[in-house]
Amino acid sequence: MNKFDSIRPYTDNEVNEVLLDLSNNRRFLKMLFANGEYSYLRLLPFSRKILGFILRNKVKSIHDVQSYQNFFESIVNSVVENSIKNFTVNGIENLNPNTGYLFVSNHRDITLDSALLNLTLHKNNLGTTNNAVGNNLLSEKWASDLMRLNKSFIIDRSDKSKREIYQSLNLASEFIWDSISNKNESVWIAQKQGRSKDGNDFT
């Protein structure tokens, strides 16, 4: 057992099984009915079974993290095209594809902050990042599964003793160090705990 198992992203050999579990998760399906392109299905008889069947067909060929991220990329591209007037990137040519980096950014949206960075990296043939996410955002297992499929690792922000807080933060620090120094994988973290809700997100 790896000491990072409780916080690490899912690995390639876990991806398909997790996706199939999600296609049978009542709470996840309920979320899809309430939001997005499948909302019309909720009016049909056996709607949950129908949606589960659709999802299983979509994910049956996804067996690794890269394939999942390719699937996810089209969603992020759509967000950029439909909601951002001007998206520019500078300095990407200075990154070495064989080196892991620590990316620290301001924080407005836990999904899009890292997604926009990773879209840029992917389009420039660079490896995507492991992304830090607080467990306070992952009370539902399906939410945790989605984030860990997309290379997120968990920062434990539960109310604990000072000793337990130190241990959990130390484990996260070790994971970050191992990713960058030993595996040459990059990591994204927000510059502070909690996103800025007033637009004032300067360091």
Tell me what each language-model feature is.
Residues F72, E81-T203:
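Soluble catalytic domains of membrane acyltransferases
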Residues M1-Y101, H107-N118, H122, S144, ...:
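Membrane-anchoring hydrophobic helices of lipid-metabolizing enzymes
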